[in-house]
From Swiss-Prot:
Annotated EC: 3.5.1.18
Cofactor(s) this protein cannot do without: Zn(2+); Co(2+)
Function (record text): Catalyzes the hydrolysis of N-succinyl-L,L-diaminopimelic acid (SDAP), forming succinate and LL-2,6-diaminopimelate (DAP), an intermediate involved in the bacterial biosynthesis of lysine and meso-diaminopimelic acid, an essential component of bacterial cell walls.
Record has Zinc as a keyword: yes
Active site: 76, 141 (proton acceptor)
Record-listed Zn(2+) 2 binding positions: 107, 142, 356
Family: Belongs to the peptidase M20A family. DapE subfamily.
Lineage: Bacteria, Pseudomonadati, Pseudomonadota, Betaproteobacteria, Burkholderiales
Example of a GO MF term: cobalt ion binding
UniProt-listed SUPFAM superfamilies: Bacterial exopeptidase dimerisation domain, Zn-dependent exopeptidases
Keywords: Amino-acid biosynthesis, Cobalt, Diaminopimelate biosynthesis, Hydrolase, Lysine biosynthesis, Metal-binding, Zinc
The name this protein goes by in its record: Succinyl-diaminopimelate desuccinylase
InterPro entries from the UniProt entry: Bact_exopeptidase_dim_dom, DapE_proteobac, Peptidase_M20, Peptidase_M20_dimer, Peptidase_M20A
Native species: Ralstonia nicotianae (strain ATCC BAA-1114 / GMI1000)
Free-text comment on the cofactor: Binds 2 Zn(2+) or Co(2+) ions per subunit.
Length: 383
């Protein structure tokens, strides 16, 4: 069994559902310390939601003046869902038909194992490497992400730490390893809209004011709005409703208010402030009595073609035999926090078709090439 596969299986066995780490980072600390890394644990969050973070760094011969390449990842996984629907124990790595099954196999314990082994191999061959290698690992990426990567980034910022390159191990591939990497992500802006009316008997609408009826024209206008045209890197911004709550449960009562949850996934062609302003203008134009609470999940980020994307594309071509596609599709990731500290952030990992699903898995044949891609990037940028 290869060291990468063995480490992947060890991590999968640990039931690290957010925010639990279940010793995953202890395993990484043992491995990285043996390879010469200085490891620091950063614990954050309230008593009922303690998050474990790891910052590990091995300085090159140029010290802090040299380039620093960081791998970012998360040891936490999403819940399994109905265990009885899995063909095998989700926390017992199982091999079937050339695939490794287990929660976190694709998202993202294989990536973590791959980069750790790549770093071990790299420093063994290049003990006097010029640049530095870092690891930023959290147990709160799949959850609210308030006490994970963002806290470590804040800490590094206060120390004046400069990050030059960051590879995030998210599962970005689609059909085969390396066919897609993410060089950016859209921003996420959510709103909770409450439209007020007057509750009353449904048989006497003239004595009430139905907030659902009042809200519908405004919601229709919001759904039809063209927020922007996107750009060369991002598709147009989207606005989607996710929940509508109204009524008392009775069929003969006009509700006093209705609550609508919605979300923007927005490109660099728009700003949170601009989107908020336009939403309020549409609601005001319809004369609604409303309140609106906003939550900014993250701003968009983009890494244009440069040293990191070229190194990664070249490594993928050499190891996987495919021409990779740079993409900004999909949801948010911790890259949004790191991008404020690091000018070049690229996400790359195994295919994502099974992530968060029953019987999550990774092709065993992709595990060593993934590690080799990571090692080639280290060779190119910091040897």
């Amino acid at each position: 069994m290869s060291p990468t596969l063995a480490l992947t299986e060890d991590l999968i066995r640990r039931r690290s559902v957010t925010p639990e780490d279940k010793g995953c980072q202890d395993v990484l600390i043992e491995r990285l310390s043996a390879a010469g890394f200085q490891c620091e644990t950063v614990v954050s969050g309230p008593d009922h939601f303690r998050v474990t973070n790891l910052w590990a760094v091995k300085r090159g011969r140029a010290g802090t003046d040299g380039k620093l390449l960081v791998f970012a990842g998360h040891t936490d996984v999403v819940p399994t869902g109905p265990v009885e629907q899995w063909r095998s124990d989700p926390f017992e790595p199982t091999h079937r038909d050339g695939k490794l099954y287990g929660r976190g196999a694709a998202d993202m314990k294989t990536s973590i194992a791959g980069f750790v082994v790549a770093a071990e191999e790299f420093v063994a061959v290049h003990p006097d490497h010029a640049g530095s290698i870092g690891f930023l690992i959290t147990s709160d990426e799949e959850g609210p992400a308030h006490d994970g990567t963002i806290k470590v980034c804040d800490l590094l910022r206060t120390r004046g730490e400069r990050l030059d390159y960051c590879v995030v191990g998210e599962p970005t591939s689609v059909s085969t390893l390396g066919d897609m990497v993410k060089n950016g992500r859209r921003g996420s802006l959510s709103g909770k809209l409450t439209v007020n009316g007057v509750q009353g008997h449904i048989a006497y609408p003239h004595l009430a004011k139905n907030p659902i009826h009042l809200a519908v024209p405004a919601l229709t206008a919001l759904a039809a709005e063209q927020w922007d045209d996107g750009n060369a890197y991002f598709p147009p911004t989207t606005w989607q409703m996710s929940n509508i709550h109204g009524g008392t449960g009775a069929t003969n009562v006009i509700p006093g208010h209705v609550i609508i949850d919605f979300n923007f996934r927005f490109s660099t062609a728009s700003t949170p402030e601009g989107l908020k302003s336009r939403v309020h203008a549409i609601l005001d134009a319809h004369g609604l009595d409303y309140t609106l609470a906003w939550t900014l999940g993250g701003e968009p980020f983009l890494t244009e073609r440069g040293e990191l994307s070229e190194a990664l594309s070249s490594a993928i071509g050499a190891e996987c035999g495919v021409a990779t596609e740079l993409s900004t599709t999909g949801g948010t990731s911790d890259g949004r926090f790191i991008a404020k500290l690091c000018p070049q952030v690229i996400e790359f990992g195994p295919p994502n078709a099974s992530i968060h699903k029953i019987d999550e898995h990774v092709d065993v044949a992709f595990i060593e090439p993934l590690k080799n891609v990571y090692r080639r990037v280290l060779e190119t940028l910091i040897a």
